[in-house]
Amino acid sequence: MNPEFWQARWKEKRIGFNQPKVNPLLIKYFSDLKMATGSRIFIPLCGKSIDMIWLANQGFDMVGVELVESAVQEFFAENNISYTIKAHDKNSNIKCYQGQLSGQTIALWVADIFMLRTNDVGRVDAVYDRAALIAMPAELRPQYSQQVIDLSQNAHQLLLTLNYDQNERAGPPFSISHEQIQQYYSAHYQIQELEGKPSTLNAAPEMTVTENVWLLNKP
C-alpha cells in the first residue's frame, strides 16, 4: 500500500469513496451472511464508514483496520462515540481505538493491514468488504485477499466490487472482473454473485460501471 497517497487523500478531503449514507447493498444483502446477533464483523480499510453505525445498531460487534489515523478519529468524533486507545504489544506504529455504540464494541486498528496478525484482529464471524479490494492495485490483490482470509480465519464474506473498462480510468477504485474474483477466492470459498447493477463513479459519472455483490461462503 502507499501510505502517502491515502494520507494525502484524507488530508485534502478527496474521499468520494466515503458514502454519506449507509450502503443500500449492505442493507439488502447482509442477512445473506446469516449472522447471529452479537457476531463480530471484520471491515478492512474501514475509513470512517457510516456502515459501521448501521451494523452496530443491528447488534453486531466490529473490528476494522484503517491506514489513516485521522479517518478513525473522525469516525468516533462525528458519531459522538467515546473511545480508548490501546497500543500494540510489539509494534509502536500500530494502535487500536475502541468504543461502544448500542451496546456493541467497535475496535478499529490504525495500521497497514499487511502488518496485522490473526491474534490482533481476534474472533471474526464474517467480513464486509465494500471499498478495500477495489482500492488495491492488481499487484497487491492476491496478497490482500489472502491476508483477509488469514486474518478472518476463512470467515464468510460479503464483498462489493466494481467492473468497468480499466483503460478508461486508472483507479482507484479499480475494476475487478469475474475472472479475478475466481482467481482470488475460489480456492477458499463457494462464490455466489448476488447482484450486478449499473452504477457510477463520483469522479467519472459518464463511465459505464457495474457494481457487483458477492457472497463468499466456506465450502
UniProtKB/Swiss-Prot annotation:
Catalysed reactions, semicolon-separated: S-adenosyl-L-methionine + a thiopurine = S-adenosyl-L-homocysteine + a thiopurine S-methylether
Group of enzyme by EC: transferase
Keyword Transferase among UniProt keywords: yes
Cellular localisation: Cytoplasm
GO biological process: methylation; response to metal ion
Binding positions for S-adenosyl-L-methionine per the UniProt entry: W10, L45, E66, R130
Keyword terms, alphabetized: Cytoplasm, Methyltransferase, S-adenosyl-L-methionine, Transferase
The EC number(s) this enzyme carries: 2.1.1.67
Any Gene Ontology CC annotation: cytoplasm
Family recorded in the similarity comment: Belongs to the class I-like SAM-binding methyltransferase superfamily. TPMT family.
Record-given protein name: Thiopurine S-methyltransferase
Organism: Psychrobacter cryohalolentis (strain ATCC BAA-1226 / DSM 17306 / VKM B-2378 / K5)
